[in-house]
């Protein structure tokens, strides 16, 4: 909608289409990278077989009887239409021209025999159906006879488009039956869904809203939350509080604001009633197709919803094979066969993934060209709205697909110019509506936090993450409810980390002021208790009684006491920050070995600010946003266009998505750690920063592969008792392999070696006793077969299910691997039989119910120079009995 308005404003004079009309049309016959143009140009529908007559064919077959002397040949003869239009034969025909000898035994009809009498053809009664072959020559009558004989034996198409075909046909659902069966209506809407992105967005919004009645109640209460009823208790009738003709006494600005709010209120009311029908359709989809009643909407997990959608997909497979090219193009992005957990997440976050990647790779210049503000990123909710309008609304069409012009290198200059114009137009638009937006932000903030601050004044100093921090912390394909669950769990640890740093000077001053204000407050309070009537009316200063100063000094005492740290607080900022990293999963590279420093604390404080400061920055953002749109963002328009072209791929059945959002579960996240060779500039450009790709990969597996029934990352369900593994058979005393087996087992270890191996974790923690429970049997149900990760990736360790206890977070909890772990390559048995390892290992664990087995441990210890002894050792490892289990 915004692009249409902008296109009308910038439309050229004359009858030619504007740039945005050409962009929205999206039909370019010369460029269609994701489809096979040669095959899509042909329609092989059985209801259009009339166009496949022998006369319209470009190939004729000359048959010879098996007993004849001639040799059967299949010759290519261009038709008159082909010769006149200058159409050459395709490549596959030119390659086969030399090999056109057909054995006589494979020919269809004898050459000399007359064809049998064919039954009367019903198509002959239709004057438009009969066609005269375009080929001329002596073979025309013979080929026509052969064609009639072949069609008489086996019809290739329906005789008449309006006649009833013979044989059993599917029975259509009667109109009365469908109108009385809500499940059939819901199934019909599901089958005829034309925009899967929009439909899945409605399904997710319905799930996140908690059902039909919760959404309607929230919308109805929103319409009346700005009404003030403070004057109602003081009056007895309505006319006492109404000022007659009050608008005449107001200024023009107030009248404009009242009328604007009135139209906005009416528009929201209309939208509220229109939305009921759409919500009813989604409600029927949940109740009748997914078997989820309304009362379970507030308790069911999203993973269970995805499993039911996949089951519904399996119950209604695709049956049509002969489809038109336009429908084939449509199904290239709207196929219901691509509806597992990863595909649904890609559809819901198709646009958000691009914004996450652009912020991660610093494509957007969010700093002002001002000397004292250079280098400081200005990002607010207002800025987020304009980024959605300027970039995403231009890059995507109505179906949620990336415009193909963004994928063409020859359109780079024009797109960059138009994007720069959109930034400038949005900047002037923001300057025009800045007063309205400022009033809206102030009113919403006041009505939202007034009661909270009045009830608890300490909430004024409460902190929360900024909008920029949320986009930095968010991972690819991470849905909003999963992201905010993870983020909200980090708030206590983030507050504890901020309070960790020593502020001795501030605390000393705060203690002194708290002691003085507390003493004065105590004296005034005791005096008011002894003689309340006389003391409370006593004025210490002019018109300022005792109760006034009692409130002032009590507020000062409460504020200063809040600035003093608790006496039981243990000072360990590095440990506190690791607890934060466990949930935010955000660790820049320059934070390594500096988690205790004040520099890291200052950078984290820019992401975790007080709510009052965030509100002031939001109001200041109304002024800084147009400056960014006018001066900073137009300079990076070329990089934005290049980003969409270079980081967009086409997935069959899904459409165009961000390349970072397509997880290759067969290969894993790749070599993202620094243990390998240093990547070159090209690899650095095509990879994410701060381990975002690896964090998103393992985070997705942690949410959808561990236990989809609960929806809690890293949760272990109560499973059955572990299966019994018999002990291995030991060799005899005289066996030459006994010494080697004893040396590689726990029995042959000395106490020093065992103690050293067990004391790698702090506190000398020994190996875990017992076999851990097996993962849920639904662990592989939310991913299709082509998305199933191999067994080695399923045991990757995650932050939510760390192998260390919560009391310790070692250096390895930085998301990426920080060093090559030589201990991991030694193959000790305690590392094979328990989920443990060295400090340098990554701690992502997506399947906490599994340990590292001999199979997947040996898979990561490849040595290209092993030699003969290494091969013998690998053979011995494969012949040993394996413990642990894997998912199929």
UniProtKB/Swiss-Prot annotation:
Biased composition (Polar residues): 13-24, 123-143
UniProt PTM: Phosphorylated by ATG1. ATG1 phosphorylation is required for ATG18 interaction and preautophagosome elongation.
Pfam families in the cross-refs: ATG9
Segments on the Lumenal side according to the record's topology features: 277-422, 566-611
Disruption of the gene: reported phenotype: Significantly decreases the radial growth of colonies under nutrient-rich conditions. Strongly reduces conidiation. Blocks autophagy.
Membrane topology, as annotated: Multi-pass membrane protein
Superkingdom per UniProt: Eukaryota
Keywords per UniProt: Autophagy, Cytoplasmic vesicle, Endoplasmic reticulum, Golgi apparatus, Lipid transport, Membrane, Transmembrane, Transmembrane helix, Transport
Catalytic activity, as annotated: a 1,2-diacyl-sn-glycero-3-phosphocholine(in) = a 1,2-diacyl-sn-glycero-3-phosphocholine(out); a 1,2-diacyl-sn-glycero-3-phospho-L-serine(in) = a 1,2-diacyl-sn-glycero-3-phospho-L-serine(out); a 1,2-diacyl-sn-glycero-3-phosphoethanolamine(in) = a 1,2-diacyl-sn-glycero-3-phosphoethanolamine(out); a 1,2-diacyl-sn-glycero-3-phospho-(1D-myo-inositol-3-phosphate)(in) = a 1,2-diacyl-sn-glycero-3-phospho-(1D-myo-inositol-3-phosphate)(out)
Region annotated Disordered, chain positions: 1-170, 748-770, 834-866
One GO BP annotation of this record: lipid droplet disassembly
Entry's transmembrane regions: 256-276, 423-443, 545-565, 612-632
Keyword NADP tagged: no
InterPro entries noted in UniProt: Autophagy-rel_prot_9
Binding partners and assembly: Homotrimer; forms a homotrimer with a central pore that forms a path between the two membrane leaflets.
Family, as annotated: Belongs to the ATG9 family.
Protein name according to UniProt: Autophagy-related protein 9
Species this chain originates from: Gibberella zeae (strain ATCC MYA-4620 / CBS 123657 / FGSC 9075 / NRRL 31084 / PH-1) (Wheat head blight fungus)
Gene: ATG9
């Amino acid at each position: 909608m915004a692009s249409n308005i902008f296109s009308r404003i910038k439309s050229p004079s004359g009858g030619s289409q504007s740039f945005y009309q050409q962009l929205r049309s999206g039909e370019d016959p010369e460029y269609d990278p994701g489809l096979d143009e040669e095959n899509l140009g042909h329609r092989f529908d059985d209801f259009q077989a009339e166009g496949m007559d022998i006369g319209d064919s470009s190939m004729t077959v000359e048959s010879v009887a098996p007993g004849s002397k001639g040799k059967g040949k299949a010759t290519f003869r261009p038709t008159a239409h082909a010769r006149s239009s200058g159409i050459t034969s395709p490549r596959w025909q030119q390659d086969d021209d030399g090999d056109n000898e057909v054995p006589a035994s494979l020919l269809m009809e004898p050459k000399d025999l007359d064809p049998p009498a064919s039954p009367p053809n019903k198509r002959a009664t239709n004057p438009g159906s009969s066609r005269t072959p375009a080929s001329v020559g002596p073979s025309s009558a013979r080929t026509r006879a052969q064609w009639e004989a072949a069609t008489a034996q086996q019809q290739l198409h329906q005789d008449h488009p309006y006649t009833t075909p013979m044989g059993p046909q599917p029975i259509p659902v009667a109109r009365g039956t469908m109108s009385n069966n809500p499940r059939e209506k819901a199934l019909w809407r599901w089958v005829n869904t034309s925009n899967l992105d929009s439909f899945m967005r409605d399904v997710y919004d319905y799930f996140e809203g908690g059902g039909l009645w919760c959404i309607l109640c929230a919308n109805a209460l929103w319409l009346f939350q700005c009404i003030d009823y403070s004057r109602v208790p003081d009056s007895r009738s309505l006319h006492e509080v109404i000022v007659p003709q009050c608008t005449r006494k107001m200024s023009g600005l107030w009248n404009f604001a009242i009328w604007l709010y009135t139209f906005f209120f009416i528009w929201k009311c209309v939208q509220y009633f229109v939305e009921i029908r759409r919500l009813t359709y989604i409600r029927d989809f949940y109740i009748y197709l997914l078997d989820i009643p309304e009362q379970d909407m507030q308790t069911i997990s999203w993973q269970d919803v995805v499993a039911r959608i996949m089951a519904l997909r399996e119950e209604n497979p695709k049956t049509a094979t002969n489809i038109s090219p336009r429908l084939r193009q449509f199904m290239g992005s709207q196929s219901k066969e691509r509806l597992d957990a990863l595909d649904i997440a890609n559809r819901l976050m198709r646009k958000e993934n691009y914004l996450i990647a652009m912020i991660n790779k610093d494509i957007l210049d969010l700093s002002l060209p001002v000397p004292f503000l250079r280098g400081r990123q200005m990002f607010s909710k207002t800025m987020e709205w304009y980024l959605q309008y300027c970039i995403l609304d231009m890059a995507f069409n109505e179906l949620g697909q990336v415009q193909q012009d963004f994928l063409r290198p020859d359109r780079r200059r024009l797109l960059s110019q138009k994007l720069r114009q959109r930034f400038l137009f949005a900047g002037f638009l923001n300057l025009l509506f800045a007063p309205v937006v400022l009033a809206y932000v102030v009113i919403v903030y006041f009505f939202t936090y007034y009661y909270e601050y009045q009830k608890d004044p300490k909430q004024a100093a409460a902190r929360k993450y900024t909008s920029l921090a949320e986009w930095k912390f968010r991972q690819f394909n991470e849905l909003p409810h999963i992201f905010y669950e993870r983020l909200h769990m980090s708030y206590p640890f983030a507050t504890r980390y901020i309070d960790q740093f020593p502020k001795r000077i501030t605390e000393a001053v705060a203690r002194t002021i708290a002691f003085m204000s507390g003493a004065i407050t105590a004296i005034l309070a005791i005096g008011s208790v002894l003689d309340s009537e006389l003391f409370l009316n006593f004025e210490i200063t002019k018109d300022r009684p005792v109760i006034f100063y009692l409130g002032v000094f009590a507020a000062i005492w409460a504020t200063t006491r809040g600035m003093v740290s608790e006496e039981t607080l243990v000072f360990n900022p590095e440990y506190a920050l690791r607890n934060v990293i466990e949930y935010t999963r955000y660790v820049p590279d320059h934070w390594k070995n500096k988690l205790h420093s004040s520099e890291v604390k200052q950078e984290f404080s820019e992401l975790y600010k007080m709510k009052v400061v965030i509100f002031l920055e939001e109001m200041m953002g109304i002024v800084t946003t147009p400056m960014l749109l006018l001066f900073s963002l137009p300079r990076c328009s070329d990089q934005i266009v290049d980003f969409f072209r270079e980081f967009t791929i086409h997935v069959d059945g899904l459409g165009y998505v961000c390349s970072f959002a397509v997880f290759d579960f067969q290969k894993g996240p790749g070599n993202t750690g620094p243990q390998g060779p240093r990547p070159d500039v090209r690899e650095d450009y095509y990879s994410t920063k701060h381990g975002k790709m690896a964090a998103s990969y393992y985070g997705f597996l942690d949410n959808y592969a561990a236990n989809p029934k609960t929806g809690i990352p890293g949760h272990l369900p109560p499973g059955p008792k572990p299966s019994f593994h018999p002990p291995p058979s030991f060799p005899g005393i005289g066996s030459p392999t006994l010494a080697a087996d004893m040396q590689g087992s726990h029995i042959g270890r000395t106490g020093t070696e065992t103690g050293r191996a067990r004391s790698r974790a702090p506190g000398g923690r020994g190996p875990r006793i017992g076999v851990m429970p097996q993962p849920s049997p639904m662990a592989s149900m939310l991913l299709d077969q082509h998305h199933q990760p191999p067994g080695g990736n399923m045991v990757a360790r995650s932050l939510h299910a760390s192998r260390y206890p919560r009391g310790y977070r070692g250096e390895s909890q930085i998301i990426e691997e920080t060093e090559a772990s030589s201990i991991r390559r030694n193959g000790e048995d305690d590392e094979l039989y328990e989920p443990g390892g060295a400090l340098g290992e990554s701690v992502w664990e997506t399947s906490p119910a599994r340990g590292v087995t001999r199979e997947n441990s040996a898979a990561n210890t490849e040595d290209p120079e092993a030699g003969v002894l290494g091969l013998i050792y690998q053979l011995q490892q494969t012949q040993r009995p394996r413990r642990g289990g894997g998912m199929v």
